[in-house]
Amino acid sequence: MKQSIRDKLELLTHRLAELDRELSSGDAVRDMDGFRSLGRERAEIEPVVALYGAYRQAEADCESARAMLADAEMRELAESELETGAVRLQALEAELQCALLPCDPSDERNLFLEVRAGTGGDEASLFAGDLLRMYTRYAERQRWKVEIVSSSPSDLGGYKEVILRIAGAGAYSKLKFESGGHRVQRIPVTETQGRIHTSACTVAVMPEADEVEAVNINPADLRIDTFRASGAGGQHINKTDSAVRITHLPTGIVVECQDDRSQHRNRAQAMSVLAARIQDRQLREQQAREAATRKSLVGSGDRSERIRTYNYPQGRVTDHRINLTLYKLDAVMQGDLDELVDALTREHQADQLAALGGG
């Protein structure tokens, strides 16, 4: 085990002893918020310290076995115990490294997923619709709840822009690496000469704020406009100004919601999306500062970065961040994203482990 990792584990062991002393003192319960905070910290640390205790016991067992090697009668038993002990040490070290990885506080949150058509005109809008179906089907496989918060349909049946809210256990942890540029190479339905075109969409994945109030938004910084929702018409065509557009003046972020017939619900949804976008911008600014000292390949979330290509003639999907190519395009577009999600998660963890070992 690297000394830097052992040092971190020793610090956690001492911290657990400190927490036990503080929590058992009579003064602790006088401040219930502080008491709960100490309890949460202890709950996070205790399993790691217990693992480290098991690791140190395995080290001690190996030392005892090593000492028996000098005894001819005990040598065979000692060699067997050393072999078993080495396997156990390796397994415990891997567990400890994973336990020490920094936890993303947003991993268990619900999320907003935005798909915007980029270069490619109508074809880009159609691809935005394909991505919407891909993510919706993936979410359904995970038994997550999906709802369209806002949409701007295109003439041919795709979307210029669409925002999904996805709610479910671990939703953000699995989809957070989808932010970036998604490129498609295929023959468009509007193409008469059979030529392959390249189009692009941008995907943004943002954790939902626990509470809109948790994001510091000054009401004086908002311009709120209401207007009549646009649509294809029919018996439920909107006769009132139920659509809502909120502009956050300091950042220029604009959110429109018109999918509900209630202005109140549209406004609440727009505020939720606005809070998530502001929080997301703050997070990306922080990540950009951190990236100046350490480049994180998978987790950069740079929206201008081309992260994936979907090549229809070859039936392949390539994720450029991890050089992974899968020849299962049809399955991926039907929501079979597990192989991509798992590979991206492993790469991110390897990146974190490298930083941990160097710390």
Curated annotation (Swiss-Prot):
Methylated by PrmC. Methylation increases the termination efficiency of RF1. It comes from Aromatoleum aromaticum (strain DSM 19018 / LMG 30748 / EbN1) (Azoarcus sp. (strain EbN1)). Belongs to the prokaryotic/mitochondrial release factor family. Keywords: Cytoplasm, Methylation, Protein biosynthesis. The keyword Ribonucleoprotein does not apply. This is Peptide chain release factor 1. Peptide chain release factor 1 directs the termination of translation in response to the peptide chain termination codons UAG and UAA. The modification N5-methylglutamine is found at Q235. The gene is prfA. GO terms for molecular function: translation release factor activity, codon specific.
